Amino acid sequence: MTLLIRPIFKVGEGSKGFLLRLAEANGLDIGVIDKLGIVFDIAVLNTLGYLPADFENTSLEKYAKSLENTLVVHGKSWNHKVPRFCPQCLQRDAYWRYEWELLFFDACHEHQVWLIDRCSECYQLLSWKRSSLMRCTCGADLRVQQAVRCPKAVVRLSKALSHQVFVTNNELPFYIVAPINLAQLQRFVRMLGTYGDSTVGLMPKRLKVNEELVNSWQLTSLAAEILDQWPKSFHMMLDSMQNRPG
């Protein structure tokens, strides 16, 4: 089904963010978009007119195909449960970046701040079911939320995650992750962040997977510091594990 207002998908935009932008433009709930069969699929978007007429052989086509492939191949690498964002990015351009939808992408590597997933007005987690891309369900403007500076190691981890989705000519922040793909890097982060915690025993009940920043920042902070000082910090982690209870 073709909707009346058809915003064009952008380079750098996230799949979930685009669908919410589409829903808002047409005064619909994002759940209605799903019921209408409008999903992030290049063939579907092209047929419905959500891609430019001169789409082929453009940077947008290359980006859209790479994103679609990553969504299919690494479906579990995405955090589509709890939205998160950088207010400074939204102030500049009103669209949802694809990186914000990645699991363990906790910081904006451009502005070097922690992302936000909880409204400072109502203190509730953001929801994809909100009616406006730029506002919380309570009506608060996301662009004026205050972000907090984050450690430089976490910034570099975010760059590494971004690089694993779309390989660039830029040098990887951590040489150790060069041979692995996105899903493998995220599992590595989860492992380092879990076992790097000195309060965790040798056999934790389960490796944490949590889409909320209040929990994931602890994993990414520990993992980023270990990767940033590799292999010294990794050896220190192993030494620490020898002295922990089983």
Role assignments for model-derived ranges:
Residues 1-246:
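Basic, alpha-helical nucleic-acid-binding regions used in initiation and control of genome expression
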